[in-house]
Amino acid sequence: MAKYDKADIERRMAGAVESLKSDLSGLRTGRANTSLLDPVVVEVYGAMMPLNQVATVNAPEPRMLAVQVWDKANVSAVEKGITKANLGLNPMTDGQTVRLPMPDLTEERRKELAKLAGQYAEKAKIAIRNVRRDGMEDLKADEKAKDISEDDRKRMEDEVQKLTDKYVAEADSAAEAKEKEIMTQ
């Protein structure tokens, strides 16, 4: 029974890139982005709940987020949750709406965020290389078990390497785009 599964390897590599893109979307640039509030949890009804389950988040202006709280009793809890999340945002309450103006990023903070984007990319590339290693080990095991020939193994190793190169390049381009976005705001 062959262990090597090209589709699984490609799926796992694509998953690493998607995870990177998700992580990068949470980095704050100068523009308002609703995904910035994804990690915020709010204590309501005696339980911790994600912000998106107690309110609607939108970006009415390029530098402002608005959180429309569904239950008026939860407004202060939402405000507290946003403050606790340490996002560097200063919530202002206006009835059932919590407004979050996006402060300007300092040059130092921009560099920190760009560096963080690079770290996220490196983690994704490590994950991709780990998937490649697993694929190569599976191919060697298949060859040892006489499921494939040496020529097949080498051909398939080239395929795995090409997939690796493709997804590493994708990770790099996603990180570069985010770094550029951060530095040019």
Swiss-Prot record:
The keyword Cytoplasm applies. Belongs to the RRF family. CDD domains: RRF (cd00520). InterPro entries: Ribosome_recyc_fac, Ribosome_recyc_fac_dom, RRF_sf. GO terms for molecular function: ribosomal large subunit binding. Its main location: cytoplasm. GO terms for biological process: cytoplasmic translational termination. SUPFAM superfamilies: Ribosome recycling factor, RRF. It is found in: Cytoplasm. Responsible for the release of ribosomes from messenger RNA at the termination of protein biosynthesis. May increase the efficiency of translation by recycling ribosomes from one round of translation to another. This is Ribosome-recycling factor. GO terms for cellular component: cytosol. Keywords: Cytoplasm, Protein biosynthesis. Residues 137-159 are annotated as: Disordered. The keyword Protein biosynthesis applies. It comes from Erythrobacter litoralis (strain HTCC2594). It comes from the Bacteria.
